[in-house]
């Protein structure tokens, strides 16, 4: 722990900011963001529970929970910073751990939720402490015989490329992006690659993607916040749109595929409003 603190002090001094999590016995786990301002330091705190929230409590749709039964492929949870992506992923990983005897490796910056071993073995690596980067940790994970890999964030071309390869080679990969819809997520992944690689990437992505969940947090009746989820599932029609570069048609496909478990964001928000969970009088604005 002393060694880690010295590394964190050096990082804070060099970069002017530091993001980390710390467990306080008998209280909670806390995520800290320390940053320099006007010659001194400030800190933003986020309280994390030791208990991993259940999917039902979070309002995660059953079709999303069903993605935990996949043996391979890529599942992306997207949304703006602070929209609850890490909590959603923690809940899904917990379901796998409680249901199957698998090896799960999580790569996080920092580690937020602590996963106990259950039927699965859960190995959690922190970027900047246990490994230098997401890309290097993900590359190493492929040699560590996991069944499931959680990548906290796909930040660059190298990480995205390795994540796709991992999904192609028989792993179930979960990760996040800062995009607001399934269509925008597909475009973001493709656009990271050089033009001459984009068509091949479309083909690869269409073959490995299993689902994209875009989420946002909305004010809740009586205080607090509630999550709304857009859900895209990789049907043959969706895979074909990705392969042909027609991501602009994905939204309409989601809207017409509700019976298959898909859900448009507008519909999710409207349903929350009808259930009196969302306070806005104009949920479709």
Q: PLM features: residue spans?
A:
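Short, flexible helix-loop junctions that flank or precede catalytic/ligand sites
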Residues: 1-280, 284
